[in-house]
Design a protein with these regions (language model features):
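Acidic/His- and Gly-rich active-site-bordering loop/insert found
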Residues: 2-113, 134-138
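Acidic/histidine-rich catalytic neighborhood of metal-dependent amide-processing enzymes
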Residues: 118-164
Length: 164
């Protein structure tokens, strides 16, 4: 088991730059809850990355809100799936990226709208599966549900039902 952990750490270390680029791309995409085009742009970026990683995806259109992204990896496993949930919207108003674009300061701290809540988590979810795939771990399926309206308590979508 220690060998697998070592291989996973190595995968993460070797992929720091692509992870950082994806994080930058997500943070620099304006996606306040009411910025539907921006939320959908984040959805498109993630969908492309997920499909490239072998994760089957589908988009659920939500009226008056951004799209919801649903993904599934390793669907053939008989074991119960793990569920990774997150959201693609932020609390930031239009123009926040122009005022505060993604950057990493001299202390290694990242800054920008949504840098932690929750765009880092979206990158981590994707790269968790990519790292598991790199060591051929296929013990359980993993499902993803990325909502578009968490910052307003899913007032426009049925995410609460889907998460339940």
């Amino acid at each position: 088991m220690e060998q697998i952990y070592t291989q996973i750490r190595q995968y993460i270390d070797e992929n720091r730059q692509p992870m950082l680029k994806l994080w930058r791309d997500l943070v620099n995409t304006e996606s306040g809850t009411l910025q539907i085009d921006g939320v959908n742009a984040v959805c498109s970026i993630l969908r492309r990355e997920m499909e490239n990683a072998g994760i089957h995806t589908r988009v659920r259109a939500i009226q008056n809100s951004g799209d919801m992204l649903i993904g599934e990896w390793n669907p053939g496993s008989a074991k119960a799936p793990l569920l990774l949930i997150g959201h693609m919207d932020t609390v930031f108003k239009e123009g926040a990226v122009k005022e505060n674009p993604f950057r990493v300061d001299e202390n290694g701290m990242a800054h920008g709208p949504g840098v932690l809540d929750m765009k880092a988590g979206l990158v981590m979810a994707l790269y968790t599966v990519k790292a598991l795939d790199s060591v051929d771990w296929k013990e359980r399926p993993i499902k993803f549900i990325f909502a578009s309206d968490e910052e307003n308590l899913h007032m426009r979508s049925d995410a609460k039902k889907i998460f339940a």
